[in-house]
Swiss-Prot record:
Signal peptide: none annotated. GO terms for molecular function: zinc ion binding. Belongs to the inorganic carbon transporter (TC 9.A.2) DabA family. This is Probable inorganic carbon transporter subunit DabA. InterPro entries: DabA. Its cofactor is Zn(2+). It comes from Rhodopseudomonas palustris (strain BisB5). It is a peripheral membrane protein. PANTHER family: INORGANIC CARBON TRANSPORTER SUBUNIT DABA-RELATED (PTHR38344:SF1), UPF0753 PROTEIN AQ_863 (PTHR38344). The gene is dabA. Keywords: Cell inner membrane, Cell membrane, Membrane, Metal-binding, Transport, Zinc.
Amino acid sequence: MSHPQSPAMADLKRLEAAADRAARAIPPVWPLASSVAVNPFLGQTSESLATAGARLARVAGVAVTMPRRWFHDRISAGVISDEDLLEAWLSAPRDLRPADLAALKAAAASDTPKPRALPSIADLAADVSGVDWPGLIAERFGAWAAGYFDEGQALWAAPHGKGAFAAWQAVTTHDLTPEIAGLRGFAFHVSEAPDSALAVIARAAERLGLKQAAMDSYFHQMLMTLGGWAQYARYALWQAELAGGSDQTITDLLAIRLIWEEALWLRYAPQIAARWASVSAAHGAPIAATPDLVTDAILQEAAERAAQRALANTLAKPAIAAIADRPALQAAFCIDVRSEVFRRALESVNPKVQTLGFAGFFGLATAHRRLASDIDELRLPVLLNPALRSCAGGPDVASRDRSERVKARATRAWGRFKFAAVSSFAFVEATGPIYVGKLVTDALGLRPAPAANDPAPLLSPALDLADRTRAAAAVLRAMSLTDRFARLVVLAGHGANVVNNPHASGLQCGACGGYSGEVNARLLAALLNDTKVRAGLTPDGIAIPADTLFLAALHDTTTDAVTLYADDHPSAAHQHDISQARIWFAAAGKLARGERALRLPRAAHQGSVARRGRDWAETRPEWSLAGCKAFIAAPRTRTTGRSLDGRAFLHDYDWKQDTSFGVLELILTAPVVVASWISLQYYGSTVAPEIFGAGNKLLHNVTGGIGVVEGNGGLLRAGLPWQSVHDGASYAHDPLRLSVCIEAPREAISDVLSRHDNVRALFDNGWLHLFALDEAGRMAWRYAGDLQWSAMSPVEAADPQPRLKVAV
């Protein structure tokens, strides 16, 4: 028998739900060691761009599109055509869009004011007191958070064992900075706060007169004012829920921020009460897009249609015939856009080389321990839990493991001596000359970062034969690689070899959780070279020839060098194949570096590209995924020989082999979602760098080992550094939402979307575009939302910019 809740209990439940919704409106950020791209609009994917723009403008002053001038320049240059503008205009809400095409163009030529967030109580108090309370809160909160969240950087670690709120309370009751600034009695105010974060939030909401309708918006704003610290707490919640648990940290941070608001209200209420009443009411008003925001969304849509038109023209060009006989080499790369340049170069070196694209973790979601390490590296997409465990080498490398551990302990002891409070002064005097050689080699870029050189990884525990066979079959079918195997098949993971770069993991493989991809590739090569596994695959219709050898490789995206792990599977019969592959890879690397040099600042030729990763002063060792704008899942023949400029994710997929459309479902729910996170992180860091970007690399300091701050402290900066999206003179990334192109029946695509609401929301609300390719690989159908499709007009390959032949 259930009992009705008391009004107070019901109110508390509603408040708790509002706090939870505010927490989920915040995107997570991963620590630097395993940094991956995250969609900064993750909490707004249930809304359209214009509606999300209204919400984010209210709580953080965020613009969700580029300034109007950016669009106007492209209209004037003819990049965005009248057809693009008209089609985007027709797709917008009738009651909010400009009256006609002329009005839309006039709007593009006019500036709009930068959005301003509703003021917090800290902002209002700053206005009447002259004290920068928002800045002081950010500084004091950041000083505490850097210690609390520290992952080993601090020599004197903060005490652990308490929740975030209790830990902050213990520190802040001894911090007199707020009182010196004029907030008298703040330490006492903190000390007498309720024990639970939820009770603190409830008390603050009551004292501030916050109505239920205003809570979601106001709580969201409070977390946004904490910058990357709130995002890191959201990461803790993400990880806990992925493991089947929960985490209270982000709620604790909301309570901390509200204690500041509450204290400032008690201090300045007589002077700010009228303005606060107006602000509170505004927080309670429904979120709605404005005509200006709809106009901005139309211009954004038009820019994307222009890019889609260019892509359609590229895909409409006559296809190159598939390799008729056995390929001279097959090389599978990650779908990462950087692989597109190298794959095209490799195919041009020898047209009988077949390249494939697949998610860089190669279907093996493993928690891996490197040599001499007890740390589990989650080398898998962050959407997944590890299904396997692996380690570097077996019992035969035990002595090497012990030796490496001794070296690591000695290095840590040396580091503690070097940085300790007392010995650091003597250290410089006593050992400074020893570092002359290192300083010279580092300054001249003569010493690269150590490359991955662990023994071949092994599954631990090992899988039985049936599980190994099932895993191999699943991966090969997902790769659409079930026949016509070459003598040598290379499985190339990718990584980046850079120095002096806190964001180095962001250059690694996102599908491998921010680590390089050689471990997964080496595990798969071992699986596919297993003769018992091959025998088990034959009844399943996958016959791998006895003379086929699988080898793992690592593609260094900074230098375009390819390292083959030939020693993992020695084969005298394949020495010529391996030598020839190395020659082809070297030639392709030279071509790829030459192409990339055209985009990189101060890269005069391909030779200078290879040195950038070793330069301690280089803020742009490579462009990583800047410029990404398309995802194509189709047979490679649809794109072979056509330059996509390193801006497209390429996933091999043959729907005719996918009888149950299980692979299609996997592509839409995993690689497409990961690619959307990447694309939208670049988008957010470009259109709103002050909120969704990491700031200026030249000002970065690593804090807590988890992230960066600009200068000496303050808010953690999440997202991409400015140097990752801008070359100093112009943008290196065009902020366009990703266009996903899939060669598969529309009914099958719609069926997958109908069973995955979160994925469908990305397309229905316009965060991604979706196209179905016809059997010639042309963009034939556009997804119109609500599981509906509209036919695209034929694209003339000879006309790079077709125009509508209608009067407007």
